[in-house]
Every structure is written in structure tokens, then in C-alpha cells.
């Protein structure tokens, strides 16, 4: 179905870019965006740095992406590639009884957050 809404969405997507963030100013921008979002929703209190970083951000199996629209950071995604060698992720902490046996059998997972 070729509607005006579909065309508008497709045109907008032409201006959306996903970037792997490995550090520096882009990483700080992610932490600031997250902090501002969490503050507005009441999920965290004031932090002097104006940035929210958690223990999952810098693990060896963590990959952070910035979502940019018209070159403006608008969202973030974080993935953990979970293996038996690197079983670190929010989901493994939340559901170890389910995931650890599967990892021990050689299964691997992608755990996506924010």
C-alpha cells in the first residue's frame, strides 16, 4: 500500500543513520541523552556529570550504537553478544537459570537494551 504516510516514513528513514560508538564525544553524548531521558521520566536522580553510565556499558561483549536523524543523536541501542566465554548481560543476570545452561550447551545470544 503506497500511502502518503508510507512515503513520508521512507523519506524520513533516508536521513536515519546508525553508528557504532567506541568512545570519545559520541559516547559522552549517549550518556547525556540517557541521563536526560531518565531524569525526565524519574528513573534516576541528579548526577553532577549530567551523564548516566551503567556497569553494562563497557563490558568486552557490549556494542553501543547511536541513532542519528539529520545528524542529531535521537536514540541509542546497546547489544551484548552473549557466549559461554562472555556471559555478561542484563538478561543473564535476570534469568541465569534459563540462560546459563543454554550457554553451556554452546548457544549464543544477542541481548538488546535501550
Q: Model-flagged regions — what are they?
A:
Residues 77-114:
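Conserved acyl-donor/pantetheine-binding loop and adjacent beta-alpha core of acyl/acetyltransferases
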Amino acid at each position: 500500500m503506497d500511502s502518503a504516510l508510507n512515503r513520508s516514513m521512507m523519506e524520513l528513514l533516508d536521513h536515519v543513520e546508525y553508528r557504532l560508538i567506541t568512545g570519545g564525544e559520541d559516547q559522552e553524548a549517549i550518556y547525556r541523552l540517557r541521563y536526560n531521558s531518565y531524569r525526565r521520566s524519574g528513573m534516576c536522580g541528579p548526577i553532577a556529570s549530567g551523564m548516566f553510565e551503567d556497569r553494562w556499558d563497557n563490558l568486552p561483549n557490549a556494542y553501543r550504537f547511536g541513532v542519528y536523524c539529520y545528524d542529531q543523536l535521537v536514540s541509542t541501542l546497546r547489544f551484548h553478544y552473549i557466549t559461554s566465554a562472555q556471559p555478561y548481560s542484563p538478561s543473564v543476570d535476570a534469568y541465569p537459570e534459563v540462560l546459563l545452561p543454554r550457554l553451556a550447551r554452546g548457544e549464543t545470544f544477542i541481548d538488546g537494551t535501550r
